[in-house]
Amino acid sequence: SQTMPQVLFTWHGGETLMRPLAFYKKAMELQKKYANGRTIDNCIQTNGTLLTDEWCEFFKENNWLVGVSIDGPQEFHDEYRKNRLGRPSFVKVMQGINLLKKHGVEWNAMAVVNDFNADYPLDFYRFFKEIGCQYIQFAPIVERIMPHQDGRHLASLTDKEKATELADFSVSPEQWGNFLCTLFDEWVKQDVGTYYIQLF
């Protein structure tokens, strides 16, 4: 019922590739059925570990944009990005990225900045350039925690105002500010128009 000429579907939340490929094929059938002349675009966010040739062929054929969650070089990424068995995931993510590149799929990177990696903005940035990523998003992680009778837990949306302590992995305001300033200084001198950072 919308009158806009273009509609963007953003597939996000949890791990999107846990859904079978048939789910997204059906979604596209429904998009085409109800498009009524509008342009339909799709983008999807994934941790990249489940990417296969089949997935990448689908994304390429249907012109999907793929966002990959990768927190920089291996030593940064593997600090917090573990699989369900608690094992590091960097190698699998890079295998997925290489498949996207092999099939010519348009992709970008989403990186979480935390207490462990926030002091190394240039290592982050140069890594993404080395792997051929032209579009980069950086997101600071700040999680509040609540005291609890059996320990501490992350605050829900309803009790955020009562939570005054931050989780240990949260990035501090000073770290985030320094991260952005250092990153901007290098980007503006060398890479404007070649590499794209969402915040700039």
Features from the language model and the residues they span:
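N-terminal catalytic cores of secreted or lumenal carbohydrate-active enzymes
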Residues: S1-F9, R19-A22
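Short helix-terminating capping/connector loops at secondary-structure junctions
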Residues: S1-Q6, A35-I40, K102, V192-T194
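Extended hydrophobic secondary-structure segments that form protein cores and membrane-embedded regions
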Residues: L8-G14, D41-T46, I197-L199
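Canonical radical SAM enzyme core domain
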Residues: T16-V66, I70-F76, R84-Q95, L99-L100, ...
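Radical SAM enzyme [4Fe-4S]-AdoMet core and its adjacent flexible, acidic
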Residues: R81-V91, N98, K102-F200
